[in-house]
Amino acid sequence: MGQKTNPIGNRLGIIRGWDSNWYGGNDYGDKLAEDHKIRKYIHARLSKASVSKVIIERTLKLVTVTITTARPGIIIGKGGQEVDKLKEELKKVTDKEVQINIFEIKRPELDAYLVATSIARQIESRISYRRAIKMAIAASMRMNAEGIKVLISGRLNGAEMARSEGFKEGRIPLSTFRADIDYALAEAHTTYGRMGIKVWIMKGEVYGKRDLSPLAGMDKKQSGTGGGKGGDAPRGKSNFNKGGKPDARKRK
């Protein structure tokens, strides 16, 4: 019944790790609500920075927030000014010392959340949903994805009755636990109402032991409780242009 479950939750502890790492104790509910508040704030504050995951780790007096993004330069800012501002803002949310780490996503076309949000933003810009989805699928397959599936639901083309339409290329073996499948859901807010976009991306199969850290294989751009002052950080290269649309040019 792999089709009925969230592919990420279904693989936790097997080939996927957790995005929140801490011991809750009696304050579990408060910390969980605070994690949700931090993630919601970061995604709203950095909406133009192509943020995917926000990983939160806690000790007694320190909250470590790790942000994975396709455009780290926007978050860091000139001389680390922007990341310092973000750190101070998160301090007010948590009432604790905050450390921010930034990791670059090298291939955003293989990140389900970035693909889903890119499709949603294009639909909001009145681009045909079929065109947006087919461009996203082509971009992912060019980056050597083994398969991708997109399901869109809502009042498509302004139809009177809501319906769903699916697009698929390659293979998505949802019942195979060793299959490395990324999944995400995004919403497009249009004049006809909300549309839901679900994306599954098959990256390959995992054999043997695997590092369950969500950051395995990523490049760290900046870290530290102060966010760092070590000059301008390079802006991450992405196959998504400024409007959030996949760039049709093939990466060399």
Swiss-Prot record:
GO biological process: translation
Residue spans of biased composition, Gly residues class: 224-233
Disordered as annotated region, ranges: 214-252
Cross-referenced InterPro entries: KH_dom, KH_dom-like_a/b, KH_dom_type_2, KH_sf_prok-type, Ribosomal_S3_C_sf, Ribosomal_uS3_bac-typ, Ribosomal_uS3_C, Ribosomal_uS3_CS
PROSITE patterns xref list: KH_TYPE_2, RIBOSOMAL_S3
Residue ranges occupied by any KH type-2 domain in the UniProt entry: 38-106
GO cellular component terms given for this protein: cytosolic small ribosomal subunit
SMART domains, per the entry: KH
Gene3D superfamilies: 3.30.300.20, Ribosomal protein S3, C-terminal domain
GO molecular function list: mRNA binding; rRNA binding; structural constituent of ribosome
Keyword Transmembrane helix: no
Keywords: Ribonucleoprotein, Ribosomal protein, RNA-binding, rRNA-binding
Subunit structure as annotated in this protein's UniProt entry: Part of the 30S ribosomal subunit. Forms a tight complex with proteins S10 and S14.
HAMAP family in the cross-refs: Ribosomal_uS3_B
Family in the record: Belongs to the universal ribosomal protein uS3 family.
Chain's role: Binds the lower part of the 30S subunit head. Binds mRNA in the 70S ribosome, positioning it for translation.
Full protein name: Small ribosomal subunit protein uS3
